[in-house]
């Protein structure tokens, strides 16, 4: 299908937008009238610019408030339409979007609306042009696609057809299944926009909160599937009104837009297959299926020699063993349970460059996959950027792709005993024994600039087939934190993404420390939280101190005896229980050099959350720790 995007979806000048659209790989573009009005060149120059860039002008928009206008305005509106037709012919497009009338004095008589639309179609048809009629969700008399099709069907003019917009239907909780009743050749154009589910005025919702398919919470595939079932094979276009998009980097946002269409096509193809609705091969994007995942293979920290020594000491106090050194690089391996941590201090390497840019930080995460080549092919099909580092003789070459912040995601197949990447690349100490009982990485949390959250969500959903939980808002003493968790389909990889638009929150401090986004929190799973915390305290791990008032509140909320509450308080263990009786015990370290911190976690009886009930007290405790005012519990 022809992939298109409206110029209003991107920031920048019209030439910048068109260049970004072409660079991203779109086939076409909707020219939004304001972009043309603010451009100093002529419509013919815009037409030539698009031709030079290899993109077609799929549509000109919008033409407003025509049908049902007061009768004394009808001729003026027809004159206005003729001027727009002149402009369209200069642009070289034959289709204009006419949106339903929103004027308070618009007339609603059905036959009058039919006659007006037929008249407009006649004027357009004489010039070889077409009218696409679209229902605005806030239209005065017409606000659903069913009404649009009813009017278009009665007008019965070959130059008049339907334009379908996902937001205008789904925002009103409309049922798209009846789209199947519209002949495919009468659907002239399709616009797609996702959005978070919000309880607000639909006009404000549309103007400020639309996003690319896959970034929001609407059923995009459920809307597109019945359209394709009609036989429609025309353009599939993005029309996004979003405050953040208006300020986002143009090329990066355009690339996200194309990725979102590819993701939507895949999801729609899968939906149609589930519904046993045949569709010819090649119509929709068909990438390699997502690989199965099995957690994190290793984490790689960018350090220098001094920081590596300090972080290594921290990890050893947490129970990690120094398991080996790289055969040819300044890289150290630490292990505990199924957790592998690499400290990369190699000069003139990717890790070194990352350290220079961000300081001590997580520069790479290795995902354990069933088929690394299939996973890499899928990632590159979704326009992921592959990475190849320097590989020494007899060393294992591990494929990787860049994350949106420039860090790396390695794709690692689990080798057999004696034939893993650790065996080939490291001189292993077979006598090294971890002193702790941490088992695996439970989850990792990222601090992101607010404007980048949607891009990260789409990246993981498309390249790796992750699912996204609903967004939650969490209280920090100095503002609000918004969090949206991603997880692999198998549940072994979990990535809460955190943003804050306030300058003094913990997330804001992390962004300042990293000079950009980064992992600020890593959680390790264990079988016995009290044993692990007792050992960590004895080893001198600096644990985050929790106010005693928190435990008084626990006593009020849960039926705990005094001895158990005292144990929780002594070890600074936080507690939560879900509606099904699942339990969470977790404790936090203080941040390593004011950057990232670790969490020790124990889940019981199927608890699957992240302890949202404890976020406020944890963030308050971290704020006090930053100011040096933390209070130790006294029993």
UniProtKB/Swiss-Prot annotation:
Catalytic activity, as annotated: 3-dehydroshikimate = 3,4-dihydroxybenzoate + H2O
Signal peptide region: none
Binding site for a divalent metal cation: 134, 165, 191, 239
Metal-binding as UniProt keyword: yes
Gene Ontology molecular function terms on file: 3-dehydroshikimate dehydratase activity; magnesium ion binding
Keyword Chloroplast attributed: no
Cofactor note: Requires a divalent metal cation for DSD activity, with a preference for Co(2+) but can also use Ni(2+), Mn(2+) and Mg(2+).
Pfam family for this entry, one: Glyoxalase
Outcome recorded upon mutating residue 206 to A: 10-fold decrease in the affinity for dehydroshikimate without significantly altering the turnover rate
InterPro entries named in the record: 4OHPhenylPyrv_dOase_N (IPR041736), DSD (IPR043700), Glyas_Bleomycin-R_OHBP_Dase (IPR029068), Glyas_Fos-R_dOase_dom (IPR004360), IolE/XylAMocC-like (IPR050312), QuiC (IPR050009), VOC (IPR037523), Xyl_isomerase-like_sf (IPR036237)
GO annotation, biological process: 3,4-dihydroxybenzoate biosynthetic process; quinate catabolic process; shikimate catabolic process
Segments forming domain VOC: 295-414, 440-590
Pathway: Aromatic compound metabolism; 3,4-dihydroxybenzoate biosynthesis
Subunit structure: Homodimer.
Note on domains (UniProt): Consists of a fusion of two distinct domains: an N-terminal sugar phosphate isomerase-like domain associated with DSD activity and a C-terminal hydroxyphenyl-pyruvate dioxygenase-like domain. This C-terminal domain does not show any 4-hydroxyphenylpyruvate dioxygenase (HPPD) or protocatechuate dioxygenase (PCD) activity, but appears to be important for optimal DSD activity of QuiC1 in vivo.
Known function: Catalyzes the conversion of 3-dehydroshikimate to protocatechuate (3,4-dihydroxybenzoate), a common intermediate of quinate and shikimate degradation pathways.
Similarity section: Belongs to the bacterial two-domain DSD family.
Protein name listed in UniProt: 3-dehydroshikimate dehydratase
